[in-house]
Regions:
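Generic hydrophobic, aliphatic-rich segments that mediate packing or membrane embedding
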Residues: 1, 14-18, 34
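Short, structured motif recognition centered on aromatic/hydrophobic residues
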Residues: 2, 18-19, 114-124, 133, ...
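Acidic, glycine/proline-rich low-complexity segments that act as flexible tails and inter-domain linkers
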Residues: 3-7, 31-113, 142, 158-159, ...
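Short gly/ser-rich anion-binding loops that grip negatively charged ligand groups
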Residues: 8-9, 21-28, 56
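Short, low-complexity cationic-aromatic patches
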Residues: 10-16, 26, 30, 106-117, ...
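Short, charged low-complexity intrinsically disordered segments located at boundaries
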Residues: 15-19, 48-54, 100-101, 149-153
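Short basic/hydrophobic patches in alpha-helices and adjacent helix-turn junctions
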Residues: 123-124, 138-143, 152, 156-159, ...
Length: 179
């Protein structure tokens, strides 16, 4: 599938960024084999030398940049999210802001609109993430990936994820569109 993606215009940087984006949503244990596959494809098939051009700025304040990304994607209600809520679980909200959004969403190679579409796919494909899938469908719509576009994305993925998860994804899109 990497060769097909490449032939349809997905660049090596975009391939790597899609895999990196997956880590926060699927976990490194599920993503690592795909990172290896992408690296082998880039080196062995395309003949490029790794590492590719760096897509992040190691000098950025991850927490600050992560919050900026969350606000840009979801709206002002995300300001202060990293320090809000139950003190017993605030560390997870902080990790989400500085790791998921500060480390991944702030990288180059893909914009917010692309990352949100990809994130929505990761969430609905794995199932069991309905609240997050609705939130990210809503973020997609907010960024310009409208309901019709998201339904086309789901339609393209039916062979890979099956009908039950595809129907659940459409339900999430419809709920997000009503909010």
């Amino acid at each position: 599938m990497l060769k097909a993606a490449y032939n349809f215009g997905v660049t090596p940087v975009e391939m790597k960024e899609i895999v990196y984006q997956a880590v926060a949503y699927l976990g490194i244990g599920r993503v690592f084999p795909f990172l290896k596959a992408v690296n082998c494809f880039i080196e062995d098939t395309l003949g490029l030398k790794l590492p590719l051009e760096n897509q992040n700025d190691p000098n950025t304040n991850r927490l600050e940049k992560g919050e900026q990304a969350q606000v840009a994607i979801f709206g002002e209600e995300m300001r202060g999210y990293a320090t809000s809520g139950d003190p017993k679980t605030v560390h997870i909200r902080k990790w989400l802001t500085d790791n998921c959004f500060g480390d991944y969403y702030t990288r180059g190679g893909l914009d917010y609109k692309q990352r949100e579409m990809i994130t929505f796919c990761f969430l609905y494909a794995q199932g069991g993430c309905k609240p997050q899938a609705i939130a990210h469908a809503k973020a997609n719509i907010r960024l310009g990936n409208d309901e019709a576009f998201l339904i086309k994305v789901v339609s393209q993925n039916v062979p890979f994820v099956g009908y039950p998860r595809s129907l659940n994804a459409i339900d999430c899109i419809e709920k997000a569109g009503k909010e």
